[in-house]
Amino acid sequence: MHTKFFLTRGIVWIAVISLLLSACAAAAPKTVATEVREEVVKTVEVYEVEAPAAVQQDRPAYEPTAAPAPSTNQFEDYGVNPYTAAVEDHLSTFALDVDTASYSVMRRYLEDGSLPPAESVRVEEYVNYFDQGYPTPPEVAFGIYADGAPSPFDHDGTHLLRIGIQGYEIPEWERKPAVLTFVIDVSGSMDRENRLGLVKRSLEMLVERLTAKDTVSIVVYGSNARTVLEPTPGNEHYQIQAVIDSLHPEDATNAEAGLRLGYQLAMQAFQPGYSNRVILCSDGVANVGNTGPDAILEQVRGYVSEGIYLTTVGFGMGNFNDVLMERLANDGNGNYAYVDTLDEAEKLFVEDLTSTLQVIARDAKVQVDFNPEVVARYRLIGYENRAVADQDFRNDAVDAGELGAGHSATAIYAVQFNPDAEGRIATIQLRWEDPDTYEVHEINGNFNTWDLDSSFETTDPRYQLAILAAYYAEVLRQSPWAADVTLDELYSLAKPLLHSLPEDEAVAEFVQLVGRAARIAH
């Protein structure tokens, strides 16, 4: 049973807050009152969410796999967040992240017959890979949603909270014109596994979606960098694709020179009010010039501040540099994806094209203010390398995350309560900068003990998916907080999702991947 609160209206109408409390398919979301702040939206709406109908599906089949050859892939271990006593630190602050590369990297490892390295796993990228089913906020920028239930893995009263941010959607035909600069790695390493061939086919999918209002330029780099296509109208598909088709692998890898020239070309073609973006396609290998992310970023930082965004797209495995690609995206005001199949390329460049190209929020960050009278301790599962100092939540000079149109971002918290405590669990606050007006907005809302579900089994299937994805990542990265959770247990819990979310191909693949990981682990 969910309690309704009175609507609180503020002075400036900017956005909507709603906390989605899905106890079961029939449960109605709660209306939430928000604290009045001068720059904050103060209106509340109620949304209805229905669970998909169940259908019968067979268990997915798995093929025997062989162990892969040793590799020189580069990943970084960011550690695992500990529990924090709410009485000692009641604030949890992090930059939003919509990257999904870590999940795709895992899939590639499983296809090659081995579990992914623990350091390659970033929990939030597993969770954010999936559609969370949040309602799109009507005629406003963002909605905040939350739900929670007892953990299916712990029997000590631990509850798992899902906190979601959903941005407004823009139809593809209404998106801003895009000024795109492709920076393509044509070094010798891109000849392996036909990496360059996958780059070509991926970019061709993107080019087919462009129109006369868009502009495309292309820079390639091996030992040196050069421009192979000057700014060209996006509807010149044949000309653009002919240049892409003509590319072939060359020698060493000077990523610094490629990005520097790419940004220079992007700046020359820059159009105020357009989506100005550099798209880097590479395996991340850099062995000529400056090779580290800090040194490379130093060469292009000025262009980033001018409003040129960066998308890094990783290809290949065996000598893949995940560290470089992620750091470039994080510090380049962008996003990071890994393409291992044409299906993944279609997801990035066709299905999510507007989300990929058009930014609706800059420096977006979340602060969760836990109530020490109710919460004994809490743990943010993931976002280890996206932490923001609590005192910097309202410091708008601190870099945070960018969200594209229709993007959502989700965080999972493990929470333990004080005995018999009831009331407000936390206040969830979102702060972001409008990329067009540069105005800073902030919205917030409360989540309470009476909003919790009584059991994991009766929660919304999308909540269950988010929790299972998070714990799948926890097991793969060997988190001490999931030491007693097995892949077999996760597979058993995941199988019902085939019936509750029958139309979602990503869910079916997830169940299959969990089963495959369990087989490999035996």
Regions found by a protein language model. Name each.
Residues 23, 98, 282:
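Residues that line or immediately flank small-molecule/substrate-binding pockets and catalytic motifs
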Residues 128-133, 145-149:
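Periplasmic polypeptide-binding modules associated with outer-membrane biogenesis and secretion
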Residues 1-70:
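Intrinsically disordered, low-complexity Ser/Thr/Pro-rich tracts
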Residues 28, 143-364, 418-422, 435-437, ...:
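Exposed acidic/Ser/Thr-rich ligand/metal-binding surfaces
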